[in-house]
Each structure stands twice: as structure tokens, then as C-alpha cells.
């Protein structure tokens, strides 16, 4: 298993992958969490679908003064200079990351990504499903589901 990686999670405001409204980042070194970062982000396009608000609880008022992904990149870019990226349902998070980088005209070589959902299906047998909250319950990991930092932490710990 990987011992050094960055676990990520994004929450979006609507169906567009560039509509990031929250990011959670957890740095794992030698199998231990060494750093955590989370931030609200002003989504592009700037509108919220009620269905998405109901899922994560983030409202337009909460992000109206937040930085854009582009403006935040100067702070978060270093977290992506890592051996690997880990996420639960990594296909979603990686597509969001790539779309946001492209929209911001940022050309970044990303490391290999690993999906804890896919890994768990291979390694953990007998669960009713492989949703993040189910896995966290199984492993005794506290999770505030659909809060980006908590989801990144859960994905990082489920990787162990």
C-alpha cells in the first residue's frame, strides 16, 4: 500500500465539474496524516442547485466572498506535487480537478491517482456497499459525510 500520498475531496455546487465550492486535502506521510487543509471556493459557474445544497449544506452566502479555484491555486498547488492522489470515487474528484485546472489555464502534471472505492471492493469483502460512509463505519472512522475535509480524511484512512 502507498505510505505517502495526498487524499482529496471536492464538493460541487451543481452538475458542472468546475463548480467546486469546497476542497478538502489530507497529506499522508509514512502512513500518518501530517497535514490537513480545507477551504470554501467560489464556484464557476456561480449558481447552486438545491439538490447539491441538500447534500453538502454549502450555500451561495457561504462562498460569496471565497476565492476562485484559480486564486486558491497559489496556496493549494503544492499539495498536488506528491507521489499519488487518493480519493473515494477518484474518477469524480480527478475530473473535477482537471476541469478546474483547465478552466483556470493552469497546466499541471498530476500524479497517479488511486480510488479507495475500487480498492475497497477488491480488499474488503462482505459489505452491503462500498460508499465512503459504509467503509468508515466498518473501520471505525468518524465521518461527517459530504464535508470535504472529512471525506478526504476518510478516504485517506480507508486507504491504510
Where are these regions (language model features)?
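Conserved non-catalytic scaffold segment of RNase H-like nuclease domains
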Residues: 1-110, 125-146
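Short Asp/Glu-rich motifs
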Residues: 72, 120, 155
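Conserved beta-strand -> loop -> alpha-helix junction used to position metal-binding or nucleic-acid-contacting
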Residues: 107-120
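Acidic, divalent-metal-coordinating active-site segment for phosphoryl/phosphodiester hydrolysis
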Residues: 148-160
Amino acid at each position: 500500500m502507498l505510505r505517502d500520498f495526498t487524499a482529496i475531496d471536492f464538493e460541487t455546487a451543481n452538475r458542472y465539474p468546475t463548480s467546486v465550492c469546497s476542497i478538502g486535502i489530507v497529506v499522508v506521510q509514512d502512513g500518518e496524516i501530517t497535514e490537513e487543509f480545507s477551504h470554501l471556493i467560489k464556484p464557476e459557474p456561480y449558481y447552486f442547485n438545491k439538490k447539491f445544497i441538500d447534500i453538502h449544506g454549502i450555500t451561495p452566502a457561504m462562498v460569496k466572498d471565497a476565492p476562485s479555484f484559480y486564486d486558491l491555486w497559489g496556496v493549494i498547488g503544492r499539495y498536488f506535487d506528491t507521489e499519488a492522489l487518493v480519493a473515494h470515487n477518484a474518477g469524480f474528484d480527478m475530473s473535477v480537478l482537471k476541469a478546474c485546472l483547465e478552466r483556470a489555464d493552469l497546466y499541471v502534471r498530476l500524479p497517479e491517482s488511486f480510488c479507495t472505492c475500487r480498492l475497497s471492493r477488491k480488499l474488503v469483502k462482505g459489505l452491503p456497499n462500498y460508499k465512503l460512509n459504509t467503509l468508515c463505519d466498518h473501520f471505525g472512522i468518524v465521518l461527517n459525510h459530504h464535508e470535504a475535509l472529512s471525506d478526504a480524511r476518510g478516504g485517506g484512512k480507508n486507504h491504510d
